[in-house]
């Protein structure tokens, strides 16, 4: 037996040794994504990159002409046969069938372009500044699956510059003060700002070097050619003092920053430029190696030192020459953003002179913002220089549904057929949302014989959406090019329209159409992680779309002197903000605490934690020192909405409702001061606000099947723990386990406490929890003669203890005995608990009753006394939430009965409580 084992191992080793590097890396990629699937990768030769796959026996055979082609083939298998989408976020699960899907007939595809670019300098600020290796590892795998082979790779360059500037006479203190804080580094690297939130800690500089080495190693192993930076003329102001004869001048002001943050530019025509370029590239090559691709931009959103065509031609020619003199194989990748952004100065004559000054084929232009303006059409295809057609799609990491699907599809076709594009890419400023649009654009780099409608239909399947959902989204919602924008909730409050161009909330579609599509998505009731992501992202947009009308009604009521009406509408506005905050909180990528915790992970001391947290707060709020870029990076995130946007709107509502006339100038001044104070304090955002709900759902059947509607209420309100009364479990009336079903729809854990056996199944109470359930109990309660048995479901999470009860509705004595049992059980098990303890449910008792009086001896009512029953004729309060007096105290933030949209879901209204811990 041992002999056979040795032979088997030997065969395995021989087969492994026979694998090509591309086959090994493709296998390693599959091992990280779908480790238990049986896949054989075969590298084959072809004149263009291509893939082909089919099932042979019990394994998938995947042929490809490169590791990139095999990765694209693997992604198509995942998309079309496993019906799954691999997220670019490391923490998102990959949902795949347990049984490996069979491919009966071979499927193939081939590359239409050889260059597939991804990323933007800004992405390293708006999304990636705090990433660790685990984040990069998943993202690089995602890029490989999409066929990306030219990733921008600018991490870690500060260490290179540190060594270079030391050689030119600067001290370490001067160098670190020249750098910005981590979140603002992209704009420092692009010669826009110096010193903002500096000095940069040495630990950050060193840590980024090690991270970049890991990034480049993995990208290269997957057949990518990382695009590294090169010197683009940006120098410290101190260099002008050290080299007074050099052609060093200040660049034009940028972003409203003061003179102390202004950048300085060394002209490429100066002899010192080549010396610095040589030193930079040699040190970068020593640390990171090279693939001979260099991405650098000389004039990103700043003026050139001269607008004379001959001068600019000389600058372009010398900039390229400085790189080529160090690396004769150098290829310059240059953003075409400047040609769009500053069309006033970059005239056709100047663009032609600038581009033609570089040897033909040695510079490739990224046509940056084609969904708005394909610059290749305005420049005679960049005067013969190769270019990559790019979709931008997101500014500032904004979380808004945007992107012209049909228009961009047509423009891609035009660029490939008529424009001679040599590549396709994406230049998103931040990840934000709308990931599917980037997946679509990158898929167009390959000929896969799939129409747009077929691609959208496949998107339905892998997003677990209703059939035709994404086609409707593409045709009705995704109509306009993205811009710097957001929802009005994220804007500084104003009386009408929007306060700033940075949060332009124009909606190019009928919001009612999105409401209808969102309802379809909810009713479909998927239970996958990607479905829940869509629900949160689209749902936040739905809630955001409702806000402008409320603001307009509020302002109109105030101006008309109808203060009571205005106050009521103001409460609605605050509640809508709270709902959006709660809904965003269901997704980790939409949480401010995730952003801040990631920043803090780079710290080596409490002082550094505060420093990194400030950098993280600064970018996504005020951005700069003046109001020029305030809210540019707005995003409807949990925690950011609660602790930043909502206080602004509360201040606005209070000022409008005050007895004194509203002073808009004073409000904006005070609002700016409040914003600056929050950023300076850089508070910790955590799960400090918890939302509880109790709901007698009547087996989800009082008015037809109400489960999807109730799940929607829970999701919109952001309830993290929900108590349910009157649940069926696998009985003849409802053959499914109702609690497990609704928990699955929401992605929650659950615990059921059977009260009685019923119709060959069970009936009772239950709890669902968004966070892990650490302990659970099912407690039987005393039974009255002739009455149904009763039970109590108890769960303990990291945040609290939460119990669900449904007390007897017939016998007085039995009800009192049930309360006595409950009180005794908690005294024995949770007396003096360091967590809050809650008792929720349908008590079948009025507030003034003896039963509630007995409960109140041990418990404090925290949910109010509004009517909860019945939904047809509300006249009783019998559903409550209590907090245990002998446990950790809480501060109630709000408590209410939810009547809006719940009158046909059950005969009881749900009760909602928001609280935070008292410290």
Regions found by a protein language model. Give the residues of each.
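Sec-dependent signal peptide recognition
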Residues: 2-10
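C-terminal motif of bacterial Sec signal peptides marking the signal peptidase cleavage site
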Residues: 15-17
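Catalytic-core regions of glycoside hydrolase
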Residues: 37, 85, 89-100, 119-123, ...
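N-terminal, active-site-proximal structural segment of metallo-dependent hydrolase catalytic domains
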Residues: 686-745, 757-761, 823-824, 916-919
């Amino acid at each position: 037996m041992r002999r056979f084992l040795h032979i088997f191992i030997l065969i395995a080793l021989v087969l492994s040794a026979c694998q090509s590097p591309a086959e090994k890396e493709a296998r390693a990629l599959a091992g990280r994504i779908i480790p238990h699937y049986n896949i054989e990768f075969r590298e084959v030769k072809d004149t263009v990159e291509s893939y082909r796959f089919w099932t042979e026996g019990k394994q998938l055979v995947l042929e490809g002409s490169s590791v990139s082609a095999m990765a694209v083939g693997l992604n198509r298998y995942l998309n079309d046969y496993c019906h799954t989408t691999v997220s670019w976020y490391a923490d998102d699960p990959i949902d795949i069938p347990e049984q490996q899907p069979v491919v009966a007939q071979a499927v193939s595809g081939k590359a239409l372009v050889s260059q597939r670019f991804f990323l933007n300098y800004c992405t390293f600020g708006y999304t990636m500044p705090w990433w660790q290796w685990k984040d990069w590892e998943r993202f690089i795998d995602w890029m490989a699956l999409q066929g990306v082979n030219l990733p921008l790779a600018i991490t870690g360059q500060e260490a290179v510059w540190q060594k270079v500037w030391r050689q030119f006479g600067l001290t370490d203190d001067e160098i670190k003060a020249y750098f910005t804080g981590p979140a603002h580094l992209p704009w420092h690297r692009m010669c826009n700002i110096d010193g903002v939130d500096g000095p940069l800690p040495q630990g950050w500089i060193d840590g980024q070097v090690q991270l970049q080495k890991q990034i480049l190693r993995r990208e290269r192993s997957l057949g990518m050619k990382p695009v590294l930076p090169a010197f683009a003329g940006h120098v410290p102001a101190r260099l002008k003092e050290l080299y007074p004869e050099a052609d060093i001048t200040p660049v034009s002001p940028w972003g409203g920053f003061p003179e102390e943050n202004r950048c300085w530019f060394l002209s490429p025509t100066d002899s010192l430029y080549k010396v610095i370029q040589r030193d930079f590239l040699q040190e970068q090559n020593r640390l990171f190696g090279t693939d001979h691709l260099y991405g650098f931009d000389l004039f990103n959103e700043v003026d050139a030192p001269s607008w004379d065509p001959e001068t600019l031609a000389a600058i372009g020619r010398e900039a390229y020459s400085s790189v080529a003199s160090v690396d004769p194989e150098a290829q310059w990748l240059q953003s075409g953003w400047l040609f769009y952004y500053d069309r006033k100065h970059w005239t056709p004559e100047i663009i032609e002179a600038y581009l033609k000054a570089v040897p033909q084929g040695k510079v490739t232009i990224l046509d940056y913002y084609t969904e708005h303006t394909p610059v290749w059409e305005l420049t005679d295809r960049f005067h013969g220089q190769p270019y990559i057609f790019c979709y931008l799609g997101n500014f500032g990491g904004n979380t808004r549904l945007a992107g012209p699907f049909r228009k961009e599809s047509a423009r891609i076709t035009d660029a490939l057929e008529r424009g001679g594009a040599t590549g396709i890419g994406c230049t998103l400023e931040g990840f934000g949302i709308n990931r599917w649009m980037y997946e679509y654009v990158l898929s167009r780099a390959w000929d896969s014989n799939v129409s747009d409608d077929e691609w959208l239909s496949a998107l339905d399947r892998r997003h677990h959406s209703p059939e035709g959902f994404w086609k409707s989204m593409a045709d009705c919602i995704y109509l306009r090019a993205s811009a710097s924008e957001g929802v009005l909730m994220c804007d500084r409050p104003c009386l009408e329209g929007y306060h700033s161009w940075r949060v332009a909330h124009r909606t190019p579609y009928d919001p009612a159409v999105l409401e209808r599509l969102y309802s379809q998505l909810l009713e479909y009731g998927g239970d996958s992680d990607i479905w829940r992501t869509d629900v949160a992202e689209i749902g936040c947009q739905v809630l955001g779309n409702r806000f402008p009308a409320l603001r307009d009604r509020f302002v109109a009521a105030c101006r008309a002197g109808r203060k009571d009406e205005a106050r009521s509408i103001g409460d609605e506005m605050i509640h809508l903000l709270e709902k959006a905050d709660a809904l965003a909180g269901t997704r980790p990528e939409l949480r401010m605490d995730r952003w801040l915790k990631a920043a803090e992970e780079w710290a080596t001391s409490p002082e550094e934690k505060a420093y990194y947290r400030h950098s993280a707060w600064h970018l996504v709020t005020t951005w700069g020192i003046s109001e020029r870029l305030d809210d540019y990076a707005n995003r409807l995130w949990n925690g950011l909405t609660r602790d930043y946007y909502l206080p602004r709107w509360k201040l606005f509502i209070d000022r409008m409702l005050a007895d004194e006339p509203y002073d808009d100038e004073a409000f904006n001044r005070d609002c700016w001061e409040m914003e600056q104070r929050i950023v300076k304090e850089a508070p910790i955002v955590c799960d400090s606000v918890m939302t509880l709900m109790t709901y007698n759902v009547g087996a989800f059947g009082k008015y037809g099947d109400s489960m999807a509607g109730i799940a929607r209420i829970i999701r919109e309100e952001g309830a993290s723990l929900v108590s349910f009364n009157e649940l069926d479990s696998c009985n003849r009336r409802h053959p499914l386990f109702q609690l497990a079903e609704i928990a699955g729809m929401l992605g929650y854990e659950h615990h059921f406490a059977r009260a009685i056996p019923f119709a060959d199944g069970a009936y009772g109470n239950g709890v669902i929890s968004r966070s892990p359930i650490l302990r659970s109990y099912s407690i039987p309660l005393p039974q009255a003669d002739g009455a149904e048995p009763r039970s109590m479901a108890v769960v303990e999470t990291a945040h609290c203890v939460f119990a669900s009860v449904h007390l007897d509705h017939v016998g007085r004595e039995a009800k009192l005995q049930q309360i006595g049992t409950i009180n005794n059980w908690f005294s024995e098990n949770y007396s003096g608990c360091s967590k809050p303890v809650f008792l929720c449910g349908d008590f079948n008792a009025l507030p003034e009753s003896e039963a509630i009086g007995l409960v109140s001896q041990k418990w404090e009512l925290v949910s109010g006394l509004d009517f909860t029953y019945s939904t047809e004729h509300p006249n009783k309060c019998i559903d409550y939430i209590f907090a245990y007096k002998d446990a950790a105290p809480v501060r109630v933030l709000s408590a209410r009965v939810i009547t809006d949209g719940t009158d046909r879901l059950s005969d009881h209204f749900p009760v909602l409580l928001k609280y935070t811990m008292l410290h």
